[in-house]
């Protein structure tokens, strides 16, 4: 019944009228009038027949000529609706009618006629078409028809709908269109009461009651009510498609097809479902959709009784019973019941995907695939379970769900006895027993038991993530992954670990976690025997053997075996970091890293160390920290067997062996193995900083360091020690400070066992063992193990000691002055816990403690092994040697000895301070 839509455009009605003269012989006119009626009044009498005339489809041209025959044409009111083809006349009382003389030789006298044209009988001029179109050569009887026709070539549409902005060629077309929005249906069938928007639709409908179909197709014998519909039908045989889309060039057999198609480009969907609000571009789409809600399935298979909502799906279904598949693919020889299915299938070989989603850009081979896909974005779930009311986006989803409910399940597996509601589900299940995996990925060759598994897998290669979290915007390749993720936002964690009481969203995640406690590693590598707690860990590991690196950086082309490695690598490139912290403006590549970072500002640290009570934001950080106490270093370098507490340190270390230096200076091009090394290096470039402090003019390389620096001026110290009340600008400084109270020294020297509160102290200390002195004086070429020692030394060359004591003594640094002042004040803040003795400097307390521990003080042999400069200890001006004997020496030698002693004391001071 698609021809019902043809009446929506005025050019269609003109097409109908144009073909009328050709169809007269075989298709009688629906409405007509006799010429004798025109002779009723010669002297101005009112025509009593005129108001009753209803000139139907083929009478439109007659009306125009009738106007010409009246002497007072201005008084005639013409209500002409091209769409409805209903013509009514209301002549005034003074309308004059002309007498039409008869011709003696006319054989058509006394017959019904359609046209009256002066003194010439219409039958003689029926075939004359005097008005020709310059564009296409088509001819028309009347100029008005030609003018109307020309609009098709110009494409002019002057009439616009206020509701949907749709445009039309004529006011009548617009008027009929507006009834879609208003819901007005003025034309009612007196047989069944059904109403229509246009008169022509009513006439078409009425033919269903009468059953009259007088216009027959010569090609196939099919009959129609009207010649215009027959003409449209004939284009199926001729292949003629005169209506072309100006946007994409697609052609159609009729204007209504073109009109509906154009809505794809305009996005117009005027037909709305009053149940769920979904909109459609055509009424037939809405009609079919409504059957989902009503459950109506009017098309029933006479073989098996199964019912369908559309005729097309019924026809597809029937092919199962017939087994007839006449349409064969010349590529793979697969056969189909219908040519349309073959055309759809061929797209697989061509790779063409003409149907694109306007939300995410995903393309599909057929419109049905696109329609189903769009439900992901709209959230539409039209398939509802009649038992529990749960709704689904796909009919297959509903079918799977129904198997949950108890009841008869006709399809039983002979292998395991499991039953299924549908045979398709049973067939899918059987592949578990047979091991059959017929669905192969054309990219990597991986096989799957079902098509849905392959579909999800393919998204790894395409990067498509259609399932988006409406809370944080993160996207996933499957619905189940999104569901797992949403548990984070809801805080739902019903599965609790009996070992450590940690909770999880899913039982599978809990099972995986428990293997940490049981140390179970069921997934073993066939190549090297290495075992893993989960399959994903094994998968990533196997890529080491195969050399596969599926995760490639689009910036530099470097590839990695895991996604996490790629994400870590991407931080090297100064590209886009879309996730910005609103507290400190620091930006991140992923939303997850931003969330982790935000916990710094919130101060949220729920994970506490049971040894030192230090708190952490994440369990992973707590686990890492605990290794400080246990001295566990599980990450071993496979090149040099050096061990590390965490994987990140091992990664950085491995770059020493590989020579990889991913962090490059954009000023001089020098590269480094770690980001921190690059930051340190950048400080050597003067005048290349981007972030300047407006208080003191000091410049920095990043906004983060500038923000940190500004706390100096603001005096902001948000991190307070609960033990002594001392405040710090940074949490890291507070953490270091707390170790004074706890006595914790987690950083232990591998050489001599000495422990330090922080890693920097250990780093400097180790240089005593290695003999490394990286800080050289540019004045005298003397070198030191620490930067502070170099600064102290440089004051010798400058001769400046800006920090003065009341006693007149001067010092290079405030810290040394503070230490000195304790001599005057008598303050001794460093107290021994064993005997209560107090000291003014920490190093003296450290030396004193060795009395209680029995630990020998640093002996000369040890010092010689580190410095390689002294053979024995010498005291100045006749001091005692180590064995207590008195030594005599010249004054110059004593001065030299004094200088050497000062150097050793400096070393001892540094050593004890660290």
Curated annotation (Swiss-Prot):
Main localization is nucleus
Q: Which UniProt keywords apply?
A: Isopeptide bond, Metal-binding, Nucleus, Phosphoprotein, Repeat, Transcription, Transcription regulation, Ubl conjugation, Zinc, Zinc-finger
* Cross-link position per record: Glycyl lysine isopeptide (Lys-Gly) (interchain with G-Cter in SUMO2): 5, 57, 60, 77, 87, 577, 738, 872
Q: Which domain of life is it from?
A: Eukaryota
Region described as Disordered: 1-35, 80-101
State what protein this is by name.
Answer: Zinc finger protein 62
A single GO cellular-component term on record: nucleus
Q: Where in the cell is it found?
A: Nucleus
- UniProt-listed InterPro entries: Znf_C2H2_sf, Znf_C2H2_type
Keyword Nucleus annotated: yes
Question: Which species is the source of this protein?
Answer: Mus musculus
Q: Where are the zinc fingers (C2H2-type)?
A: 131-153, 159-181, 187-209, 215-237, 243-265, 271-293, 299-321, 327-349, 355-377, 383-405, 411-433, 439-461, 467-489, 495-517, 523-545, 551-573, 579-601, 607-629, 635-657, 663-685, 691-713, 719-741, 747-769, 775-797, 803-824, 830-852
Membership in a protein family: Belongs to the krueppel C2H2-type zinc-finger protein family.
| Modified sites of kind Phosphoserine | 881
């Amino acid at each position: 019944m698609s021809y019902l839509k043809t009446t929506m455009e005025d050019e269609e009605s003109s097409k109908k009228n144009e073909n009328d003269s050709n169809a007269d012989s075989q298709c009688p006119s629906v409405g007509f009038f006799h010429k004798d009626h025109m002779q009723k009044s010669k002297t101005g009498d009112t025509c009593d027949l005129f108001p009753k005339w209803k000139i139907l489809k083929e009478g439109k041209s007659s009306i125009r000529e009738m106007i010409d025959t009246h002497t007072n044409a201005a008084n005639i009111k013409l209500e002409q609706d091209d769409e409805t083809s209903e013509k009514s006349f209301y002549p005034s009382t003074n309308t004059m009618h002309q007498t039409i003389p008869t011709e003696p030789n006319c054989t058509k006298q006394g017959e019904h006629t359609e046209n009256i044209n002066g003194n010439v009988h219409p039958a003689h001029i029926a075939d004359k078409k005097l008005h020709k179109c310059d564009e296409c050569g088509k001819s028309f009887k009347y100029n008005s028809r030609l003018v109307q026709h020309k609009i098709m070539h110009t494409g002019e549409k002057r009439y616009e709908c206020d509701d949907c902005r749709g445009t039309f060629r004529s006011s009548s077309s617009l008027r009929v269109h507006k009834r879609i929005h208003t819901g007005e249906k003025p034309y009612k069938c007196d047989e069944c009461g059904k109403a229509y928007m246009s008169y022509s639709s009513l006439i078409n409908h009425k033919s269903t009651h009468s059953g009259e179909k007088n216009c027959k197709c010569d090609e196939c014998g099919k009959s129609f009510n009207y010649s215009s519909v027959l003409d449209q039908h004939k284009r199926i045989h001729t292949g003629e498609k005169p209506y072309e889309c100006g946007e994409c060039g697609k052609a159609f057999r009729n204007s209504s097809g073109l009109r509906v198609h154009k809505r794809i480009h305009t996005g117009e969907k005027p037909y709305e479902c009053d149940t769920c609000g979904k909109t459609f571009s055509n009424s037939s789409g809405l009609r079919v959709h409504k059957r989902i809600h009503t459950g109506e399935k009017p098309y029933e298979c006479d073989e098996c009784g199964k019912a369908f909502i559309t005729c097309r799906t019924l026809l597809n279904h029937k092919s199962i019973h017939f087994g007839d598949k006449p349409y064969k693919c010349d590529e793979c020889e697969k056969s189909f019941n219908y040519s349309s299915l073959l055309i759809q299938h061929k797209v697989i070989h061509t790779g063409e995907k003409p149907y694109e989603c306007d939300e995410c850009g995903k393309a599909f081979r057929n419109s049905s695939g696109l329609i189903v896909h769009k439900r992901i974005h709209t959230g539409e779930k039209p398939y509802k379970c009649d038992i529990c009311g749960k709704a689904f986006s796909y009919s297959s989803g509903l079918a799977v769900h129904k198997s949950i409910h108890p009841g008869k399940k006709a399809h039983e597996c002979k292998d395991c006895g499991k039953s299924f509601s549908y045979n398709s589900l049973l067939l899918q299940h059987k592949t578990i027993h047979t091991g059959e995996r017929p669905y192969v990925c054309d990219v990597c060759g991986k096989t799957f038991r079902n098509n849905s598994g392959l579909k999800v897998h393919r998204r790894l290669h395409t990067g498509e993530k259609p399932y988006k979290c409406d809370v944080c915007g993160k996207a996933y390749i499957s619905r189940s992954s999104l569901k797992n993720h949403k548990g984070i936002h809801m805080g739902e964690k019903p599965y609790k670990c009996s070992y450590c009481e940690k909770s999880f969203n899913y039982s599978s995640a809990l099972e995986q976690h428990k293997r940490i406690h049981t140390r179970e590693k069921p997934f073993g590598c066939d190549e090297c025997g290495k075992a893993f707690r989960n399959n994903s860990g094994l998968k990533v590991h196997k890529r080491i053997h195969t050399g596969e690196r599926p995760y490639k950086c689009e910036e530099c082309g470097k590839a990695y075996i895991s996604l996490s490695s790629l994400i870590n690598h991407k931080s090297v490139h100064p590209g886009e970091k879309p996730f910005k912290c609103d507290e400190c403006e620091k930006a991140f590549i992923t939303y997850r890293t931003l969330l982790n970072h935000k916990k710094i500002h919130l101060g949220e640290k729920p994970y506490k160390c049971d040894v030192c009570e230090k708190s952490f934001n994440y369990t992973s950080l707590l686990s890492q920290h605990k290794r400080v106490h246990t001295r566990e270093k599980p990450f071993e370098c496979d090149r040099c067997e050096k061990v590390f507490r965490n994987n990140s340190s091992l990664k950085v270390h491995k770059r020493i062996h590989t020579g990889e230096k991913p962090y490059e200076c954009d000023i001089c091009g020098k590269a480094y193995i770690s980001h921190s090394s690059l930051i340190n290096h950048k400080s050597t470039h003067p005048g290349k900083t981007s972030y300047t402090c407006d208080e003191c003019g000091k410049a920095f390389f990043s906004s983060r360091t500038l923000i940190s620096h500004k706390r100096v001026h603001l005096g902001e110290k948000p991190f307070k020690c609960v033990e002594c009340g001392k405040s710090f600008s940074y949490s890291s400084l507070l953490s270091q400070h707390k170790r004074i109270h706890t006595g914790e020294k987690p950083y232990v020297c591998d050489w001599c066992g000495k422990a330090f509160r922080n890693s920097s102290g250990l780093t400097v200390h180790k240089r005593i063992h290695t003999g490394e002195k990286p800080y050289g004086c540019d004045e005298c070429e003397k070198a030191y193990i620490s930067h502070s020692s170099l600064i102290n030394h440089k004051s010798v060359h400058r001769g400046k000691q800006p920090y003065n004591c009341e006693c007149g003594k001067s010092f290079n640094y405030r810290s040394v002055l503070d230490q000195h002042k304790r001599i005057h004040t008598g303050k001794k803040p460093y107290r021994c816990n064993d005997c209560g003795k107090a000291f003014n400097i920490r190093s003296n307390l450290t030396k004193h403690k060795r009395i209680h521990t029995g630990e020998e003080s640093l002996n000369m042999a040890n010092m010689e092994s580190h410095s390689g400069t002294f053979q024995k200890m010498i005291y100045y001006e006749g001091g005692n040697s180590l064995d207590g004997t008195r030594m005599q020496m010249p004054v110059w030698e004593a001065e030299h000895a004094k200088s050497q002693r000062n150097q050793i004391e400096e070393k001892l001071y540094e050593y004890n301070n660290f």
